[in-house]
Amino acid sequence: SSSFISHEQAWINLNRELPDSKDFDDIKSEGRKAWNNELSKIKVESEDSDYGISNKIKFYSCFYRTLLFPRQFHEYDKNGRQIHYSPYNGKILDGPLYTDNGFWDTFRAVFPFYSILYPEKLGEIMQGIMVNPYLESGWLPEWSSPGHRDCMIGSNSASIIAEAYIKGIRNFDINIAYKGILNNSENEGPLSSVGRKGVKDYNKLGYIPFDSSVNENVARTLEYAYNDYSIWKLAEELNRPQKELDVFKKRAEYYKNVFDPE
């Protein structure tokens, strides 16, 4: 057994997950049952051919891998209360924490998939992968692994939060999440893994110029514009001031600035 919290917590985890009353076959059976329960939530019909069977195998293999992440980082104490070691500030804190996810890779399809199949669970994930990291570090993550890791461009945390809330998912603190979104949209972070690189040029010019010190200029401009579109739609849902709506509505069209009309 293992724990990020303490030796005592590792024993709690072990006794909860592998009590003496269960043997190897019991655990194997429970694992098979748990996975079949999840994978049976979608039924795929295929033609009875090598091609059809191959596609069916491919679908369920991808479904299985989709459910592996984000990873649950929190643990349950002896009273069943959620607690976690924070990779953001080194403290032991209450509540959920999820990690091991890069949003540039997952905002397009994975999180929309969760919102359809696991709406209630997604709310807890939002609290654990967006809200709590912001409270513990002052920044929304873009790739948590398990803390802030530098790789992903854009601020797609905003896109994921906006989609979840607009689709009716409410069991997370949207007000804290929105504060994090606004902070990301206006600032470069103290680490290159958070905030927006080139944000001053982007907000002033409507794009990140090629001769700036920031790489991936066009890609970042496109990502930021989509992120700002998402913020605009979320701000509408939250009844934010019109002046604020106008800012993000304008920025949402900055993608046009990197297209050559010829």
Pin down the residues of each PLM region:
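Short helix-capping and inter-helix turn/linker motifs at the boundaries of alpha-helical repeat units
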Residues: 53, 88, 100-103, 151-152, ...
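Flexible loop/turn segments at secondary-structure boundaries
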Residues: 5-8, 69-73, 83, 110-111, ...
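Active-site cavity-forming subdomains of large catalytic enzyme subunits
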Residues: 121-129, 133-259
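Acidic/polar, glycine-enriched structural segments that form the non-catalytic walls/loops
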Residues: 1-97, 141, 170-171, 175, ...
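Second-shell loop/turn segments in exported
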Residues: 15-24, 40-50, 97-99, 110-115, ...
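A conserved hydrophobic secondary-structure block that centers on an alpha-helix together
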Residues: 45-52, 93-100, 106-112, 116-140, ...
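Long, His/Glu/Asp-enriched segments that create or flank divalent metal/ion-associated functional microenvironments
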Residues: 262
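Alpha-helical support elements that line or immediately flank enzyme active sites
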Residues: 61-75, 99-101, 105-122, 162-168, ...
